[in-house]
Regions:
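Hydrophobic faces of transmembrane alpha-helices in multi-pass small-molecule transporters and flippases
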Residues: 10, 15-18, 33-64, 69, ...
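Helix-terminus/linker motif at the lipid-water interface of multi-pass membrane proteins
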Residues: 56-89, 107, 145-155, 212, ...
Length: 251
């Protein structure tokens, strides 16, 4: 139960502390490590504000898109909800790589190793393509079955729309992976404002789709909304990355 879980975690903490004290004393902070200047505080504060604003804008875009979906009927909403849950699960490899990549980039920024950043980004982009291929194969064989499993529905509209959402989105996983890796990498390189613009592109794109395309093309527009926006965002972010002075210094 919960008591056992808490006890196990407590034991893990004690063992980790003992191991650090015995074998990895370099991780123990000293007095000199606690002396930080105002520059570091400002850097952390401004970066957190940038990331917070980006998340807020992304959430606002999701609310706008949901407003457009709500007028398409309960069965369409049910299929879309199931598909989004599956999408949130299948894009975890991309999000995990982007998070790991941001740490890798920031460490090599501190170590002044731009060549390692370039090589790491290329490998992350290739990884995104591999995830895309796996997603396409998975959705081609199991999209409708997975929607039925998640939704618990046998309604043809629910299964068809949910499966179509997954099938049409899967080929764009490579674009999404490049988008996430590049945006997180730019933030790790100290870029605060330029990555924020990508979220503005997303918000504006979703507003346009809700006002113009969804009323005309119905759920097809909902399916293509995010993949098309991802393409614009990725093009912008990659252009910013290719002009990043640390990664690509002018000779």
């Amino acid at each position: 139960g919960s008591e056992m879980c808490i006890r196990d975690r407590g034991i893990s903490v004690v063992l980790c502390v003992l191991y650090v004290l015995a074998r990895v004393r370099i991780l123990i902070p000293e007095k000199k490590h606690l002396a930080v200047g105002s520059h570091l505080y400002w850097e952390l504060f401004s970066q957190s504000i940038s990331m917070g604003l980006m998340s807020s804008i992304v959430s606002a875009g999701s609310v706008v898109l949901q407003y457009g979906i709500n007028g398409l009927g309960t069965l369409t909403i049910a299929g879309h909800t199931a598909a989004r849950k599956l999408f949130a699960f299948t894009d975890m490899p991309l999000i995990s790589m982007a998070n790991a990549g941001s740490t890798f980039v920031s460490q090599n920024r501190g170590a002044n190793q731009p060549d390692r950043v370039r090589r790491g980004m290329r490998q992350m982009y290739l990884y995104s393509v591999v995830v895309m291929v796996a997603a396409v194969v998975l959705m081609s064989f199991g999209a409708e079955w997975m929607v039925q499993l998640i939704s618990g529905s046998t309604e043809p509209i629910v299964l068809e729309n949910g499966a179509r959402y997954l099938l049409w989105n899967a080929p764009f996983y490579a674009v999404l992976g490049v988008l996430l890796c590049t945006r997180y990498a730019l933030q790790s390189l100290g870029q605060k404002v330029l990555p924020l613009f990508s979220s503005v592109i997303e918000l504006v794109g979703k507003v346009i789709f809700v006002l113009v395309f969804i009323p005309k093309f119905q759920y097809n527009a909902v399916i293509l909304c995010e993949p098309i926006i991802w393409c614009f965002m990725t093009a912008y972010l990659v252009a910013v990355y290719l002009h990043e002075p640390f990664v690509f210094p002018k000779k």
